[in-house]
């Protein structure tokens, strides 16, 4: 088995089965450190437009993708793939010139890559939470309302490396620059995303990236499974052959490889962090992994660290832009009543739920700390104030339920079965059952959780048995579940007669627990998706009467929709934020979403590494480009050396 010198990122993060003994060789080519990074959950899709939906996804995607603009560590918008930009007030256009950087396969990033990627997101058939961030582009919104075509959208390549964007009238172009700094709007490769539409984002051979790292290898769902990211040697280096490894390492990206592993228990992670070579050989609880050299020590622990972890008291914390939340299906007969939703919120002790993780804070609003109000240094959360109680009020919850005319009922709480979600779900179940409700828990793996969160067209449903995820009529797919090729089956789908009238659409869940990720340090990206017309959901363009869809909660408030419309048309961030304060207040009165706690990035670092404090981006994720190991930079696994 391979050994890797270690910087070890856990709690998101887990220690691998790859730490048993073989020697180390000096890397005379000075490629840089091999860094072991231990995360507790894998990324299901490497499509940034679809997968920027929780703190773990942000960690992965921000390592491998870069947008036209980007945020620095303080949340300020700076140039990303853009080299220069110029705004012409008369023509209302922004012209971007791209810098000399390339995809991970060596092909230089072009203006056409942005035209394709942004039109792909804006296509009415495509679902993406970030879609409304592009609505400042001329005819982008009209396209999704059925009054324009893709050809009408204000995106054009002037030449290979120059992109022209025509904006809607009255738009502050600086707000658009802030929006396109989101990782969700990073470009993807048309020759892979269009040809291998259903599989490219899950195959390491088809994932071509624009950022500091690229996907070298993925071993998903297997014993000792791991993900290997390697320095993108073409990042800022289109003349790769003329620049030495040493310059690329020192100037752009210090580590050569990041190795993410997904196997061992929290206790074993603690053992590895505390391990020293003088302790001799130590076997971990899996009975196979041994620690027997200095390189086996965990040097870096980060992520959603459980409060019960033995190392918790030593952790440092940084805020993330994610809020653990509950989405309620307002089309459910019970949850359609605002009084029921209010009762469910009042019954929860947010302080107790937050205490499960180091650094997590009770959410008294949906918009997280770290989101600005006007200036970058200002706080939306501070201006908006506390909208929800941090502690439970069972008496008020029972009163709200009674006022809604409800004394009993059954609800299913669905969640992704990772980290400590089960513990959170169990606490929620116990709180709600004190109200006289019956709560069923439904833990799912990533694939089937995504299915539950997808819209269903009545008459064309996929019928899936929740216990075995199969039905009566089998069809083979390329889907891999739990690391093995699995037959996923579908019931016959009714052929809908297109009479020009859009069929009923719905979501097949009661309540889902998820990590709600803010896409930019702006409250608009948090709140806009709950408004009809800004949800980003695909629309059924095959029907004459197609119209924008609601958020997956089914929430549709004319008053809320109007507030988001006003915010969209605001001319600066402060004016927009003032309107969004009112929007958040209304949203959390109606409560289609119940915020629980704001996640934190809790981490520890040993003296063997440096640069870790410079590597945390505005999302609270580690960029790793500046992290180095002074004692281990020139070491690589012996098996790697022998293969060179």
Predicted features and spans:
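Extracytoplasmic/peripheral linker and loop segments enriched in polar/acidic and small residues
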Residues: 342, 388, 441-449, 468-508, ...
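N-terminal lobe/hinge region of extracytoplasmic solute-binding protein
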Residues: 38-89, 119, 208
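Periplasmic-binding protein-like
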Residues: 331-374, 423-424, 586-595
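Extracellular/periplasmic solute-recognition and catalytic clefts
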Residues: 216-228, 257-331
């Amino acid at each position: 088995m391979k050994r890797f010198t270690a910087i070890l990122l856990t709690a998101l993060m887990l220690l691998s089965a790859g730490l048993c003994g073989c020697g180390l060789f000096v890397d005379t080519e000075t490629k840089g450190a091999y860094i072991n990074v231990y995360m507790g959950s894998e990324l299901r899709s490497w499509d940034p437009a679809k997968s920027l939906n929780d703190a773990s996804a942000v960690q992965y995607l921000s390592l491998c993708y870069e947008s036209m603009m980007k945020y620095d560590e303080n949340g300020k918008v700076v140039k990303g793939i853009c080299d220069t930009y110029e705004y012409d007030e008369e023509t209302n256009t922004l012209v971007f010139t791209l810098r000399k950087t390339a995809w991970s396969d060596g092909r230089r990033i072009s203006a056409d890559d942005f035209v394709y990627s942004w039109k792909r997101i804006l296509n009415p058939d495509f679902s993406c939470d970030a879609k409304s961030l592009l609505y400042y582009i001329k005819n982008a919104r009209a396209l999704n309302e059925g009054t324009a075509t893709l050809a009408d959208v204000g995106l054009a390549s002037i030449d290979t490396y120059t992109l022209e964007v025509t904006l809607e009238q009255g738009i502050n172009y600086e707000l658009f620059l802030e929006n396109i700094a989101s990782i969700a709007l990073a470009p993807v490769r048309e020759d892979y995303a269009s040809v291998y539409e259903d599989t490219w984002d899950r195959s390491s051979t088809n994932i071509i990236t624009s950022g500091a790292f690229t996907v070298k290898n993925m071993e998903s769902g297997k014993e000792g499974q791991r993900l290997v990211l390697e320095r993108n040697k073409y990042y800022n280096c289109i003349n790769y052959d003329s620049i030495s490894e040493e310059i690329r390492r020192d100037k752009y990206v210090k580590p050569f490889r990041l190795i993410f592993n997904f196997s061992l228990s929290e206790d074993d992670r603690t053992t590895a962090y505390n391990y020293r070579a003088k302790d001799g050989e130590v076997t971990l609880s899996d009975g196979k992994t041994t620690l027997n050299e200095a390189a086996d020590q965990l040097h870096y622990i980060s992520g959603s660290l459980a409060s019960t972890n033995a190392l918790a008291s030593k952790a440092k914390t940084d805020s993330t832009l994610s809020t653990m939340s509950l989405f309620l299906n307002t089309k459910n007969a019970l949850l359609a009543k605002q009084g029921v939703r209010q009762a469910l919120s009042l019954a929860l002790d947010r302080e107790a739920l937050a205490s499960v993780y180091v650094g997590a804070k009770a959410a008294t609003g949906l918009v997280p700390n770290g989101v600005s109000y006007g200036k970058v240094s200002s706080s939306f959360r501070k201006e908006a104030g506390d909208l929800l109680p941090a502690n439970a009020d069972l008496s008020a919850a029972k009163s709200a339920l009674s006022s809604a005319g409800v004394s009993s009922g059954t609800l299913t709480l669905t969640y992704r079965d990772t980290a400590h979600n089960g513990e959170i779900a169990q606490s929620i179940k116990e709180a709600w059952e004190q109200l006289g409700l019956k709560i069923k828990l439904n833990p799912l793996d990533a694939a089937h959780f995504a299915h539950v969160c997808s819209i269903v067209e009545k008459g064309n449903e996929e019928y899936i048995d929740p216990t075995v995820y199969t039905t009566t009529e089998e069809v083979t797919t390329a889907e891999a579940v739990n690391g093995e090729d699995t037959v996923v089956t579908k019931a016959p789908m009714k052929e809908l007669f297109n009479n020009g009238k859009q069929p009923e659409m719905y979501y097949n869940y009661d309540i889902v627990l998820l990590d709600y990720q803010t896409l930019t340090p702006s409250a608009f990206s948090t709140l806009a998706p709950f408004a009809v017309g800004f949800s980003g959901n695909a629309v059924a363009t095959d029907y004459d009467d197609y119209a924008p869809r609601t958020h997956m909660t089914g929430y549709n408030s004319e008053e809320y929709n109007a507030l988001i419309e006003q915010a969209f048309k605001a001319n600066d961030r402060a004016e927009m934020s003032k309107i969004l304060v009112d929007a958040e207040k209304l949203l959390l009165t109606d409560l289609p979403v119940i915020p629980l706690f704001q996640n934190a990035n809790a981490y520890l670092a040993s003296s063997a590494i440096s640069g870790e404090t410079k590597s945390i981006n505005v999302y609270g994720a580690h960029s790793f480009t500046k992290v180095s190991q002074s004692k281990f930079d020139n070491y690589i696994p012996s098996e790697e050396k022998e293969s060179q």
